């Protein structure tokens, strides 16, 4: 992920001016990395090292989504809708 791509994702999902670490931003960045790695694994089927990293990222995103779901359900629903994720 390039710097400009990362900045555009942060600008899209930030909740205030200097926001880089809110759950929404973290989930969006993880989703982008997951999608990129998923494309990589379609062509490199035996890359088990990257597959393990993908599974760790999916688990981390799931934990952040569960946190939002438990504490701020409206923000959770908004993030799910904007990223097109399943519940």
UniProtKB/Swiss-Prot annotation:
Any GO CC annotation of this UniProt entry: cytosolic small ribosomal subunit
InterPro entries: Ribosomal_uS15, Ribosomal_uS15_bac-type, uS15_NS1_RNA-bd_sf
GO-annotated molecular function: rRNA binding; structural constituent of ribosome
GO biological process: translation
Xref: CDD domains: Ribosomal_S15p_S13e
Matches recorded under PANTHER family: RIBOSOMAL PROTEIN S15, BACTERIAL AND ORGANELLAR, SMALL RIBOSOMAL SUBUNIT PROTEIN US15M
Self-association and partners: Part of the 30S ribosomal subunit. Forms a bridge to the 50S subunit in the 70S ribosome, contacting the 23S rRNA.
Function: One of the primary rRNA binding proteins, it binds directly to 16S rRNA where it helps nucleate assembly of the platform of the 30S subunit by binding and bridging several RNA helices of the 16S rRNA. Forms an intersubunit bridge (bridge B4) with the 23S rRNA of the 50S subunit in the ribosome.
Protein family membership: Belongs to the universal ribosomal protein uS15 family.
Name of this chain's protein: Small ribosomal subunit protein uS15
The species this protein was found in: Alkaliphilus metalliredigens (strain QYMF)
Gene name, Swiss-Prot/TrEMBL: rpsO
């Amino acid at each position: 992920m390039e710097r400009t791509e990362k900045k555009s994702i942060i600008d899209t999902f930030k909740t205030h001016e200097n926001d880089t670490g809110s759950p929404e931003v973290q989930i969006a960045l993880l989703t982008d990395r997951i999608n990129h790695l998923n494309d990589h694994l379609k062509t490199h089927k035996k890359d088990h090292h990257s597959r393990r990293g993908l599974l760790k990222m999916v688990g981390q995103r799931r934990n952040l989504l569960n946190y939002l779901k438990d504490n701020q359900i409206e923000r959770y629903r908004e993030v799910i809708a904007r990223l097109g994720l399943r519940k």
